[in-house]
Amino acid sequence: MSGYGDFLKGLLREPGAVSAPTPSSPALAAAIAAKVDPLQSGLVVELGAGTGVVTQALLDRGIAPERLIAVEYCAYFAGLLAQRFPGVTVVQGDAFAFERYLPAGSQIAAVVSGVPLLNFPLPRRRALITRALALQGPSGRFVQLSYGWRPPISSAFGIAPEKTIVWRNFPPAHIWTFTAQEQPVAQQAQAQRTAGWGRPAQALFRISPPTS
């Protein structure tokens, strides 16, 4: 089945678990993956991996499968991911609690998010981004896909994202890139205290492929 067909099937099976208007285009996926440095050591965490268009782009970018953790809320999409990317750790779970799926003491190179953050309250958006950045080194980044024309959190919070517009997608999309070095020290400390970092590695799991 095509990527769009898989997207529609997931939408019909679990309408409450799918928030994206359409699957990402290859051009958008490549632009997102280009924000991740494959030479930066550590895990790359993809939140809201969907049908795997961005997952494939990250692999094409040079991210080794064993370095990639894909978190997806929709059970059908998570099954597709497990089937298509056997070397990638696929987790069916909550992107806002992604830390619990990480091995204790893991180094994070980047977090890539396709979760529609503008659909969630501002405090949840801010907490997710600041926690994700706090878990990374100074070169870490949080890359957010959005179909809105405003960033998920404003520069008033002391974090000014870089903006990229991708026109070769329907609808046109924004990529907001937040870097760890921009985050105020006080926010980093608070995020580390509340992140739940260091959960057991057993929380990682691969799920079974979907049945037709």
What are these regions (language model features)?
Residues 52-56:
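Glycine-rich SAM-binding Motif I of class I
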Residues 126-138:
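A short glycine-rich, Lys/Arg-flanked "PGG" loop and its adjoining helix->strand segment in the class I
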Residues 74:
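Conserved SAM/SAH-binding beta-strand->alpha-helix loop
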Residues 81-82:
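Conserved SAM-binding loop
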Residues 41-50:
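Conserved class I S-adenosyl-L-methionine
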